[in-house]
């Protein structure tokens, strides 16, 4: 089983955003799909090897 990490931290670690605060804002606005699902809670723990997509919110 893969290790899990907070989504906001994972986005920073992957270099997608410049800060955790920015990641949290974008996540709450619905900009990221994780494993095919839109996640809106920054503290959601996801596998570190999960596929993340940048999407336009509805």
Q: How would you describe each model-predicted region?
A:
Residues 1-48:
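A basic, amphipathic helix-loop patch mediating RNA/tRNA/ribosome contacts
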